[in-house]
């Protein structure tokens, strides 16, 4: 079973990805991780990607699809995989559609974790940081003493990109980028929309019901 996982920042996608990989025995392939691995190992693709990353530019699709193809060619994905962070755009989805037949693979389902904006803002704006690196959440993971770090007693602060205006901006960019992709996979009959507003286990139950059809 091969899955594409979509979800906005704050949707709990990372948590669900771990649970899916464990229960359904599929390889979790995070684009960011494999890109960094290529750069670390100094592969040809990694060297190319590093030039763009060092210049603060986006890595071109032609390099990304090479890195994805390389990963999907490895024997450990034979039992199935879950792509997380790729594709993000229509050209990337089209590039993926081109290479999959060469690898004798196909995408079975595209999980789209859907969460209302106000819930995403609540989740993301509650984060508080300490200079020592610890992070907290005023609702989900509060410090023992409000405003103080449990580890070092330091003053907690609210990062600018965790403030409501910045979050709404990030979500707007995500939607502009991802909506065409959702439409693309809806047309292909692959989309499964998941209500991501509930509790972690509740969301996972819904995902499990969808995925059990492909086992």
Curated annotation (Swiss-Prot):
Zn(2+) binds at residues 130, 132, 149, 152. The keyword Plastid does not apply. The keyword DNA-binding does not apply. Residues 126-162 are annotated as: LID. It catalyses: AMP + ATP = 2 ADP. HAMAP family: Adenylate_kinase_Adk (MF_00235). Monomer. Belongs to the adenylate kinase family. This is Adenylate kinase.
């Amino acid at each position: 079973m091969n899955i594409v996982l979509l979800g906005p920042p704050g949707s709990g996608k990372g948590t669900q990805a771990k649970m899916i990989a464990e229960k359904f025995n599929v390889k979790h392939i995070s684009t960011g991780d494999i890109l960094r691995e290529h750069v670390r190992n100094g592969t040809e693709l990694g060297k190319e990607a590093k030039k763009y990353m060092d210049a603060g530019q986006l890595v071109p699709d032609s390099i990304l699809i090479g890195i994805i193809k390389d990963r999907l060619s490895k024997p450990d994905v034979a039992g199935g995989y879950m792509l997380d962070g790729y594709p993000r755009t229509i050209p990337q989805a089209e590039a993926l559609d081109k290479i999959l037949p060469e690898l004798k693979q196909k995408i079975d389902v595209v999980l789209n974790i859907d969460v209302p904006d106000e819930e995403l803002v609540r989740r993301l704006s509650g984060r508080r940081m300490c200079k020592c690196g610890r992070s907290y959440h005023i609702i989900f993971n509060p410090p023992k003493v409000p405003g103080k770090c449990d580890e070092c007693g330091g003053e907690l602060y609210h990062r600018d990109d965790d403030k409501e205006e910045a979050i709404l901006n990030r979500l707007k960019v995500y939607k502009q980028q991802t909506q065409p992709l959702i439409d693309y996979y809806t047309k292909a009959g692959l989309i499964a929309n998941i209500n991501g507003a509930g509790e972690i286990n509740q969301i996972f139950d819904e995902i499990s019901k969808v995925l059990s059809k492909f086992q």
